[in-house]
Amino acid sequence: MAKKSIVNRNLKRLKTVNKYAARRAEIVSILRDAGSDIEAKASARDLLQKLPRNASPVRLRQRCALTGRPRGVFSKFGLGRIKLREIAMRGEIPGLIKASW
């Protein structure tokens, strides 16, 4: 089980990312537009730097929904490898079976 403070920090970052997502998308579209002039891009870059650090989606960490484990998380299920195996062995995930060859 991960520390609750770390899990809560990640949730706080997720809220910040969602809060600034639209504003960030507008600024990034100005920066990526080939037709915009240099002054507009410079001002957009300044606006992007003024946003909070945690508004960047890169700072989010994918964690297990049950335990908060940061590594070995399957994005399709949102679970860590250990919990995924436990739940799959109980047959609670439809269509997921143990491989045998």
Swiss-Prot record:
It comes from the Bacteria. The keyword Ribosomal protein applies. Keywords: Ribonucleoprotein, Ribosomal protein, RNA-binding, rRNA-binding. GO terms for biological process: translation. The keyword Metal-binding does not apply. GO terms for cellular component: cytoplasm; small ribosomal subunit. SUPFAM superfamilies: Glucocorticoid receptor-like (DNA-binding domain). One of its GO terms (molecular function) is rRNA binding. Belongs to the universal ribosomal protein uS14 family. Part of the 30S ribosomal subunit. Contacts proteins S3 and S10. PANTHER family: 30S RIBOSOMAL PROTEIN S14 (PTHR19836), SMALL RIBOSOMAL SUBUNIT PROTEIN US14M (PTHR19836:SF19). Binds 16S rRNA, required for the assembly of 30S particles and may also be responsible for determining the conformation of the 16S rRNA at the A site. This is Small ribosomal subunit protein uS14.
